[in-house]
């Protein structure tokens, strides 16, 4: 599994937050920026919120950029259920960015459900990575 620049910045943001510093870091780019979710949930965690606010900061600095947020799920559940869950995850991520001032027209959403796992395999150590919303530049 590759670790993107954004993932490293998200880690820095989490460390700064733990130290009482700013918890929002603007990424250098949006190369497969991801936020992760708990099982059967589309709720945005504080770590995910910081990540998404960093994405919004990037979009504010790059007004011509449009993105797509793809919601994903782990392999448990039916195809239909996971497609709906993936869409809720993508929509929840989009909502955070839009509430921070980004025009909703710049963000499209799609769900892949369980069809495009980030990591192949079974078990929670794998599934936790497949429950995500991934932002890519269009």
At which residue positions do the language-model features occur?
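Hydrophobic helical h-region of N-terminal Sec-dependent signal peptides
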Residues: 10-13
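Extracellular/periplasmic catalytic domains that process cell-envelope and extracellular macromolecules
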Residues: 28-29, 125-129
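A non-catalytic structural micro-motif
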Residues: 64-72, 87-118, 131-138
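Short, solvent-exposed beta-strand/turn patches at coil↔beta or beta↔helix junctions
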Residues: 24-54, 74-79, 117
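Bacterial N-terminal signal peptides that target proteins for export
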Residues: 1-8
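Short beta-alpha junctions and helix-cap segments that line functional grooves
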Residues: 120-123
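C-terminal motif of bacterial Sec signal peptides marking the signal peptidase cleavage site
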Residues: 15-18
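Extracytoplasmic/secreted proteins, especially bacterial periplasmic and envelope-associated proteins
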Residues: 47-54, 80, 84, 88, ...
